[in-house]
Amino acid sequence: MSAITWRPGQPKQEWGPRAWHWLHLMAINYPPDPSENDMARARVRIGRFIQSLPCADCRIHAAAYIAAVPPDASDAQSLQVWAWRFHNAVNRRLGKRQFPFAAYRQLYLSEMCWAEWSSACP
């Protein structure tokens, strides 16, 4: 999965869905039985992803979240649950709707969500 690049001054409404799309598809594509190297790489990728966010407040909030609730990269299901909880925590803080886990999996496993940067994904 390639890195995301942001345009300077790009509004959150544009880059936010792309960021979530990247994070969730990374979790969905994660191996069911990862090696120690896979686990370390996933945590590094998530850390770099957080550091790359174009919004300073978002980087601060995301870094605080992963410091309190580190990514669980022990297996695919755990990483998916972590990404889902992280997204719901951000939505809760922003006063947005929460997604049930079943709806999350159905959405991010659907073909229409697999198109790069699909508008079908939140």
Please identify what each model-predicted range represents.
Residues M1-P122:
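Terminal, compositionally biased segments used for targeting/anchoring and flexible tails
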